[in-house]
């Protein structure tokens, strides 16, 4: 647990010393610690009436305040993220659009300030996207019908531990939670907490700083080929071991049935804001949340397995193009996008450029099969007639491309030069097939750069 201590209200504060301490703490955490978010589920069967009313009111007041910020920003000259977070009352409207003034009873001023920051970040994101050209026009932020998260900024002030329970500000009773054992990490330091409302219940997401873990690599290189029929095909160079991993999370019958009911109501122009519509929407969200949790679990297990390798090589596949070309359902039911997004951030990952022909080359004789179609599952070399599985062959080629690129000087590693390098090697092999391939590669790489000393001591092919 954290040993954070705070001065009492009676003692004078040395702001310069506090600022210096914050800078030192931030530098120490950046160099020695990782940020992790642990999710604890509130035990809904142990809630009394006061706690239930608090959980209902805090999200309701958060919605009122968020919408009041948007309304404040629609007045000319005002910005939505500069709304007064210290005001003790908020104006909202009933179904007949009559104004009602209510007092904040559950949502603290610090939480309201966090909502202001969230709105400011959203405005900044919209502005930058307009400037870059990702979006052409926008109406700005709009009013919302619900808010599903509330931030508690400061540990031991806005939120704290009460034994094995969690106490939130403005709530007299602490909450019993599942998953408290996750926090038993040596040297852990707590930052902020976030109360989240999901279809499956209420959760508290605790942001922590934990000491960095040193992963023991197995000094092996693995190539990963993404696909639709087979989600992932892996090849380990040192052991010549290949695997085919398929992940498909189908919609349950309950989810399909609920989706049909909602679609039928929409076709008959019934509102989904009625009691029945809201009940069906909640059921659908709960079933989708369950499927999303299954995908997340499979993704975490696969990423944990990949972290043990010294080098992970994969190609930056264009999944959005796959989705638009008739493979949308397979992409939606799989975990390709999730795995790609996480693995790209790992320190032991090397990402190949998306336009490299990883399936068409055969690196033993360095010939290219130009007639290979997307639907063909076998690779046949036009020169030596070797027949191999297409996906395993692509995973092997990714490691070969990685080794080839690592031999090239850093200033010559742009995609255009790499493609010219491949064409040059292929031509030289055709002219003199008896010459060793490694010697040809070294000659071509030395010709890329005038600094021949940069190619001294090249790794062997």
Model-derived features with residue positions:
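Gly/serine-rich nucleotide phosphate-binding loop at the start of the catalytic core
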Residues: 2-114, 460
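Positively charged, helix-rich recognition surfaces that bind polyanionic ligands
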Residues: 3-9, 200, 204-461
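Catalytic micro-motifs at enzyme active sites that drive phosphoryl/nucleotidyl and oxygen chemistry
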Residues: 28, 190-194, 207-214
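Generic detection of short hydrophobic beta-strand segments and adjacent strand-loop junctions
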Residues: 36-45, 171-183, 243-250
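Short amphipathic alpha-helical coiled-coil/interface segments
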Residues: 59-62, 115-123, 280-291
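Stable alpha-helical structural segments in soluble proteins, enriched in small hydrophobic residues
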Residues: 69, 114-127, 392-402
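Long, hydrophobic, amphipathic alpha-helical segments used as structural scaffolds
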Residues: 70-77, 123-134, 210
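Acidic carboxylate diad motif detector
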Residues: 87-198, 333
């Amino acid at each position: 647990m954290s040993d954070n201590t705070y001065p009492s209200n009676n003692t004078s504060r040395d702001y310069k010393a506090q600022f210096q301490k914050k800078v030192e703490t931030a530098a120490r955490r950046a160099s020695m610690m990782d940020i992790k978010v642990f999710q604890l589920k509130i035990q809904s069967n142990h809630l009394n009436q006061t706690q239930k009313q608090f959980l209902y009111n805090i999200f309701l007041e958060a919605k009122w305040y968020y919408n009041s910020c948007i309304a404040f920003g629609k007045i000319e000259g005002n910005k939505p993220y500069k709304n007064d977070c210290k005001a003790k009352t908020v104006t909202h409207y009933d179904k007949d659009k009559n104004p009602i003034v209510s007092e904040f009873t559950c949502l603290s001023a610090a939480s309201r300030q966090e909502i202001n920051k969230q709105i400011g970040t959203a405005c900044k994101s919209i502005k930058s996207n307009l400037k870059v050209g990702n979006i052409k026009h926008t109406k700005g932020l709009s009013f919302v019908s619900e808010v599903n998260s509330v931030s508690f900024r400061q540990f031991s002030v806005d939120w704290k531990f009460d034994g094995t329970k969690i106490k939130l500000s403005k709530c007299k009773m602490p909450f019993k939670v599942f998953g408290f054992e996750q926090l038993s990490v040596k040297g852990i330091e707590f930052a902020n907490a976030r109360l989240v409302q999901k279809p499956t219940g209420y959760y508290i997401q605790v942001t922590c700083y934990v000491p960095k873990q040193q992963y023991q690599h197995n000094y092996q290189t693995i190539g990963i080929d993404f696909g639709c029929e087979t989600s992932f095909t892996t090849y380990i160079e040192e052991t010549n071991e290949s695997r085919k991993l398929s992940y498909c999370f189908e919609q349950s019958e309950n989810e399909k049935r609920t989706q049909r009911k909602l679609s039928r109501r929409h076709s008959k122009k019934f509102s989904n804001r009625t009691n029945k519509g809201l009940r069906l929407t909640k059921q659908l969200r709960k079933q989708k949340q369950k499927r999303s949790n299954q995908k997340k679990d499979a993704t975490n297990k696969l990423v944990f397995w990949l972290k043990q390798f010294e080098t992970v090589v994969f190609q930056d596949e264009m999944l959005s193009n796959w989705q638009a070309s008739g493979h949308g359902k397979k992409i939606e039911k799989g975990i390709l996008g999730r795995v790609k997004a996480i693995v790209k951030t790992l320190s032991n990952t090397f990402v190949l450029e998306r336009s490299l022909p990883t399936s068409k080359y055969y690196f033993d004789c360095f010939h290219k099969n130009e007639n290979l179609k997307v639907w063909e599952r076998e690779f046949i070399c036009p020169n030596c007639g070797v027949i191999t599985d297409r996906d395993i062959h692509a995973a092997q080629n990714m490691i070969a491309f990685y080794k080839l690129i690592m031999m090239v000087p850093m200033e010559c590693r742009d995609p255009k030069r790499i493609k010219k390098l491949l064409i040059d090697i292929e031509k030289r092999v055709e002219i003199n097939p008896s010459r060793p391939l490694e010697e040809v590669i070294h000659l071509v790489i030395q010709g890329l750069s005038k600094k021949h000393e940069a190619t001294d001591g090249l790794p062997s092919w």
